[in-house]
C-alpha cells in the first residue's frame, strides 16, 4: 500500500529548535541561566526517560497480549487494547493497529479487521509491511474477496516468511473458485499434515465444501 504525502520525522528538529529558543531567551530576553537550565531538562526526559517508559509499557502489553491470545480471551484482549491509551497515542501505531486487527480477525469481525490492517499499513515501516499485508489478505479471503487476497499473496517478497502460507491460501482460493482443482486439492492435502490448527480447520472446511 503506497504511502501518501511527504513523510517527515519532526522529532529530529526538536534539539535544533530548542537551541534556537535558548539563544533567543538568553540574548533576546536576557533570561537567567537557571531558566535555561530548567528549559533543557526536557532533553533527557524526552530522549531517555520517555523511551524507557514506553519500552516498559510495550513489553508488558506484548506479554499480556500473547498470553490472552493463546488463551483465546479475545473479549478480554479487546478491553485490554482499549485501556492502552498511552500506547495507542504514543506507542508504535502500526504494531498496535496490527494487534487490534488480529483481535478482530479472531473474533470473526472481518470488516473491522480489514479496515484496521489497512490503517496499520498506512503507518507501517517497510520492514513491517509483509506481516500486515499477509494478515490483510487472510481477512479478505474470509470476506470472499478472493481476487484482492490473491493479488496480495502473490505480491509478497520471495524471501517472505509467509510465502509458504501464502501458497496454501492461493490453493484454497483456486479450490473455492474452481480453478486448477485437482492440483489445489493435492497441495492442500499435503499442506494439511503440517498445518497449524486454524489453517487445518480452514483446509478441512474448503475440502468439504468444494
Per-range role (PLM):
Residues 45-72:
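Transmembrane-cytosolic junction motif
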Residues 63, 98-99, 135, 168-169, ...:
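"A position-specific structural signal for the A-helix of alpha-solenoid helical repeats
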Residues 71, 107, 143, 177-178:
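Structural motif corresponding to the intra-repeat A-B loop/turn of tetratricopeptide repeats
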Residues 74, 110, 146, 180-181:
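TPR-repeat structural position
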Residues 77, 113, 149, 183-184:
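Single-residue signature of alpha-solenoid repeat helices
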Residues 89-93, 125-131, 160-169, 193-205:
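Boundary/linker segments of alpha-helical solenoid repeat arrays
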Amino acid at each position: 500500500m503506497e504511502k501518501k504525502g511527504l513523510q517527515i520525522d519532526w522529532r529530529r528538529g526538536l534539539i535544533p529548535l530548542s537551541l534556537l529558543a535558548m539563544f533567543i531567551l538568553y540574548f533576546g530576553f536576557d533570561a537567567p541561566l537557571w531558566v535555561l537550565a530548567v528549559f533543557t531538562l526536557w532533553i533527557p526526559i524526552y530522549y531517555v526517560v520517555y523511551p524507557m517508559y514506553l519500552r516498559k509499557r510495550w513489553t508488558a502489553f506484548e506479554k499480556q497480549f500473547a498470553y490472552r491470545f493463546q488463551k483465546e480471551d479475545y473479549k478480554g484482549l479487546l478491553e485490554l487494547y482499549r485501556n492502552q491509551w498511552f500506547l495507542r497515542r504514543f506507542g508504535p501505531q502500526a504494531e498496535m493497529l496490527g494487534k487490534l486487527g488480529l483481535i478482530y480477525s479472531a473474533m470473526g469481525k472481518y470488516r473491522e479487521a480489514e479496515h484496521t490492517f489497512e490503517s496499520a499499513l498506512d503507518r507501517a515501516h517497510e520492514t513491517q509491511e509483509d506481516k500486515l499485508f499477509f494478515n490483510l489478505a487472510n481477512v479478505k479471503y474470509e470476506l470472499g474477496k478472493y481476487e484482492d487476497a490473491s493479488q496480495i499473496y502473490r505480491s509478497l517478497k520471495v524471501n517472505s516468511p509467509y510465502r509458504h502460507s501464502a501458497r496454501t491460501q492461493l490453493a484454497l482460493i483456486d479450490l473455492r473458485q474452481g480453478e486448477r482443482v485437482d492440483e489445489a486439492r493435492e497441495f492442500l492435502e499435503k499442506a494439511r499434515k503440517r498445518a497449524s490448527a486454524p489453517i487445518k480447520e480452514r483446509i478441512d472446511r474448503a475440502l468439504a465444501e468444494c
